[in-house]
Amino acid sequence: HFLEHKLFERENSEDMMAAFTRLGADSNAFTSFTKTSYLFSTIDHLLENLDLLNELVGDVHFTEESVLREQDIIQQEREMYQDDPDSRLFFATLANLYPDTPLATDIVGSEKSISEIQVSNLKENFTEFYKPVNMSLFLVGNIDVKVVEEYFSKKEKKTLEQFTVTKEKLPLQPVKQTDSLRMEVSSPKLAVAIRGTGQITEEESYRYNILLKLLFTMMFGWTSDRFQKLYETGKLDASLSLEVEVNSRFHFVILTMDTKEPVSLSHQFRKAIR
């Protein structure tokens, strides 16, 4: 996540987002549990924007001074999430599903881990992981595929040392069944979650993700009989949200909602899932 921030820094200290903006593109990035994604949206100058994207993930230009500045920025981002009840609820629920694993740790990091990050850590991470073999490019829209293929065929192909990442199984501990947080909120919040069992191949994960979303939407979504009854009786509002994560190493479903009757709804939702 820290490296994601710093890759937007160009050699002349200009922010890469400004370069995308000059080409009429909107750019962004995010880091999830398993990947970092860099994206842009544009109606013109596709190849020029691809040049910027290649530059973005192709080299690093940060300094010790800029890393120190970024530490303060990310500490502020972390504090912002700590003050967000929905974010706190989600990550606390995840920590209960996967106690004592990396999934129980906030992606942004802790105050201590952020303060300890150095230029050498970031460059080592970049050197080992930011290689074409670890990257996928997705283009969506009215695009001439041949033009894009020709564009990449002209790019210089570098000979890179292969690096194998050993993916270890998560050391699964028993799920923590119930927990609570205390924050100042206008309405109590509830999360009901399920941890999947067994492993799913990468090829199966997309289909499995869609199936889970369809199943839980039919069971609890806005058009379901269950939701309509709870909504009409005032026990549930439109805040109901579904989060599905499917990966070859883990998969889970988390339902979050605002409700004046968290204990009653927790019982009803858990009973329906069983």
Model region roles, listed by residue range:
Residues K6, R10, D15-T164, F216, ...:
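Charge-rich, well-structured scaffold segments of protease-associated domains
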Residues E161-D225:
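His/Glu-based metal-binding/catalytic segments typifying zinc-dependent metallopeptidases
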Residues H1:
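Short, conserved beta-strand/beta-arch hydrophobic-aromatic motifs that form part
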